[in-house]
């Protein structure tokens, strides 16, 4: 639903409310994240679909190589850093005050957020929404970090933390997330978003970014994953 445009600027960020984004309720089914859409249906999250259809060979090999306890420690620490970094970036986008925090994880996440702000968000000319709940009726839902305009084009944008720099072949799920959110936005709000951008900062403060290079290809792969998921659970 499009609404009358409201614009405000804070700390250099132009926040333009072009659409009425409603937060979706989250639910857990068999331990997997789902969302409740406005029609009352519960649909799987994008990450639930991707997790259920992912080849886990490399992950299992990594856990076996370093040990389950060490792997869990790394996973938990990375998740905590990612959560704090996302919160810091959300505050920046909304023009709220940000502080480095008092513990090492907070300080590291704050520094990583600064890297993304300085290297990636400078090319964002409009922000339409932050932490936006999106859904494709009857199929899936999810939350994207940012919807707005990147280098002149409407875009879905996500923030990621990493322990090291990524190769393109390692981030296929990121592309699938982006097109899933874009397809949901286009369906629900009658838009034509074809641009998606991932902003990454490593825990050593190295910046990296990836953009959807072939929207049709990645959209096809996403719908194939979705079909695989529903065949698996039905």
Where in this protein do the model-derived segments appear?
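Metal-dependent nuclease catalytic cores that hydrolyze phosphodiester bonds in DNA/RNA
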Residues: 1-141
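Mg2+/Mn2+-dependent nuclease catalytic core
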Residues: 128-232
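Short, surface-exposed secondary-structure junctions/capping segments
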Residues: 58-65, 226-234
């Amino acid at each position: 639903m499009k609404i009358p445009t409201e614009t405000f600027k804070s700390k250099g960020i132009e926040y333009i409310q072009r659409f009425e984004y409603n937060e979706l309720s989250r639910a857990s089914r068999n331990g997997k994240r789902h969302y409740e859409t406005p029609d009352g249906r519960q649909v799987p999250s994008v990450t639930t679909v991707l997790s259920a259809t992912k080849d886990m060979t490399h992950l299992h090999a990594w856990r076996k190589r370093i040990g389950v306890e060490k792997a869990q420690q790394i996973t938990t620490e990375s998740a905590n850093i990612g959560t704090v970094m996302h919160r810091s970036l959300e505050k920046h986008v909304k023009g709220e005050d940000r502080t480095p925090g008092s513990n090492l994880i907070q300080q590291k996440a704050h520094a990583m957020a600064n890297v993304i702000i300085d290297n990636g968000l400078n090319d964002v000319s409009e922000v339409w929404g932050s932490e936006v709940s999106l859904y494709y009726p009857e199929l899936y839902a999810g939350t994207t970090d940012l919807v707005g305009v990147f280098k002149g084009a409407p875009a879905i944008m996500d923030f990621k933390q990493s322990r090291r720099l990524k190769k393109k072949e390692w981030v296929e799920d990121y592309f699938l997330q982006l097109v899933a959110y874009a397809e949901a936005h286009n369906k629900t709000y009658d838009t034509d978003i074809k641009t998606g951008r991932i902003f990454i900062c490593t825990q050593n403060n190295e910046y990296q970014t990836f953009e959807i290079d072939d929207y049709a290809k990645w959209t096809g792969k996403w719908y194939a994953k979705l079909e695989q998921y529903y065949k698996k659970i039905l």
